């Protein structure tokens, strides 16, 4: 879930970690704290031209496994293990 996360300076990373720890010390779960801080960072860097473009999981929902391999590529189950005794 790093879609659209910008590259952060060391100082920005430290600030993010401190905010996450602060939220957790107040009783928030680590997942919630990370999600909240990530959303804040995305909002601050919304129009940042250096923000990395990373694909979301749903970008691949319309594709099947066969879309990502060649037709002549064998299934893992069909490959005989040549190194077995």
Curated annotation (Swiss-Prot):
<feature type="compositionally biased region" description="Basic and acidic residues">
    <location>
        <begin position="57"/>
        <end position="72"/>
    </location>
</feature>
<feature type="compositionally biased region" description="Acidic residues">
    <location>
        <begin position="73"/>
        <end position="85"/>
    </location>
</feature>
<dbReference type="InterPro" id="IPR005371">
    <property type="entry name" value="UPF0181"/>
</dbReference>
<dbReference type="Pfam" id="PF03701">
    <property type="entry name" value="UPF0181"/>
</dbReference>
<comment type="similarity">
    <text>Belongs to the UPF0181 family.</text>
</comment>
<protein>
    <recommendedName>
        <fullName>UPF0181 protein YPTS_1774</fullName>
    </recommendedName>
</protein>
<feature type="region of interest" description="Disordered">
    <location>
        <begin position="57"/>
        <end position="85"/>
    </location>
</feature>
